[in-house]
Structure formats: C-alpha cells, structure tokens
C-alpha cells in the first residue's frame, strides 16, 4: 500500500481509501454508499490526539487524494438528490428530509447561526453570500428559511449545472424564490460585489488543499468590507481526512473570533472571523490585543467546553445594492 503507518485508525482509513479508489464510479450506488458510510463512521469519533498535519508525507498524500474523492462523491450525491427533489410537483423544499444527511445540515446551520448571532451584536445581516453552494444548497436554504428570514442570499458556484438544479429547487417556494439568487462564476473573478455582503460563508470544499484555501481567503480579504464576517468550515482530529483544515494563521487580515469543534455527528468545525480595517462608517475593526500574528499552535489557544460538550476555542478579541 505504501501509505499507512502503525496506527489502527489510520490503517483502517487507508484500507477504505484503497477500496474507494478502486470503485468504478463515485455516483450513488450500494458499493459507494457502503464504503463512504464506513469512512464517515471511522473518522467521526472525536480524537484530539490525531493530528494529520504531523503525519508522514505518504499519509498526507493519501489524505489529499481522499478529500478530493470525497468532494467528487459529495457532488454526485447532492446532484442525485436535488434531481429527485425537483421532480416533485409541489414545493421540493417540503421533501428535504429525503436527503440522508439533512439532519446534520439542520444542526450545522443552527450552530453556525448561533455563533453568528453571538458576534453580530444584534445586527441582522441584509445580504449573505455562500461560496461553493453546489446543487443542493442546504445551508443557504436552512439559514434563509429558519434563521435569517429577512436576509438576501447570493449563492456562488463555478458549476453551471449545479446552479441550474439548485435554482429549480427553490423556484417553487414563494419566499426563497424572492430572496435567493444563484451566480455561475469563479469566486476569484468576483471583486467589487464582495463588498456588498455582511456575511460570507465559504464552503468546506472550496479550496481542497492549504494553498488553494489560502488563495481564496486572501482574495476575500482583499475585497470584503471591513467589519464583515467570514464563516468557514474546517475539520478536527480524524475528521480532517474528510475535509480541509483551516487554521487561524491562514486568515491574515481577519480577526478570528471563535473556532468550534462539534463532537457529535456534525462533521465540520466552524471558524468565524471578522474582516479588519476601517468600514464605511469610519469604525476601525482591529485586533483588541493587537496580536496580529495569532499562532497556529493549538497549545496557545484557551480551550473550554460548552454546555453541549463540544469544544470551543475562544480567541482574544471581542453596501452595495442587491445583486441581480
């Protein structure tokens, strides 16, 4: 195999990677579903002792390949279920529970909204961007329908087929069809429009490796308005075999407000940060402690447990018109 080290968990992940790599297709079918369920169940138990960034180059290469495979399979799965949902004659959004991971999205979106609310100080965002929304934009749908009921959502995806099926998904809904818009574009080509968003969500699989992720973050830092919030998804422990890791030091030009590591079936960690600089009202958003070089060393981060027994890492520190 060449990838694995003497660790039972990592060996199991390596074994599943080998099997998944040999699949004839990553589109939903019995073999694909079985192997990916095994992979998720293997990676999901919290294990803070697992640090993928310190593993061998062979393991790092396997992980990088596995994340790309997971991203491709996730895209096929979302396309599959979005097509099923849009086949209903009534409102497709009434049948979202058919998607096998819908409850996970409900929990993740609630966690993200709670963190967002804690850092908005009573302000309700008028405009929200979701970058990498995909064919089944569940985060946008759940946030718009359950939490941010007056906000306008702009979904960006580079894949025209993803946007086409996603737009059909909300077209029958009398509310979301008026508040949710889809843009087929590479986010690296979007500049001035980014200044019009109060909150920007970056999907976990936009930028599948460290270099790509940092490049996207640098672009957002250049064009987002000071004071706007950036919500990112990361991964912790063995879950980092499924999704890329975002570390505080990757967010130059932003103040990291919170990092949240769920310990239940919600896979993604949540990172919330604020764009630094002087906003249109003359308010300067800067690090309260001026510690601009926040370390990536987790031992320097104060870790506490919240009431839900999930890990939260609290860091020091406390309009363009509607797009068409």
Curated annotation (Swiss-Prot):
It comes from the Eukaryota. Keywords: S-adenosyl-L-methionine, Transferase. One of its GO terms (biological process) is pollen tube growth. InterPro entries: Nicotian_synth, SAM-dependent_MTases_sf. It catalyses: 3 S-adenosyl-L-methionine = nicotianamine + 3 S-methyl-5'-thioadenosine + 3 H(+). Its EC number is 2.5.1.43. Synthesizes nicotianamine, a polyamine which serves as a sensor for the physiological iron status within the plant, and/or might be involved in the transport of iron. Belongs to the nicotianamine synthase (NAS)-like family. This is Probable nicotianamine synthase 4. It comes from Arabidopsis thaliana. The gene is NAS4.
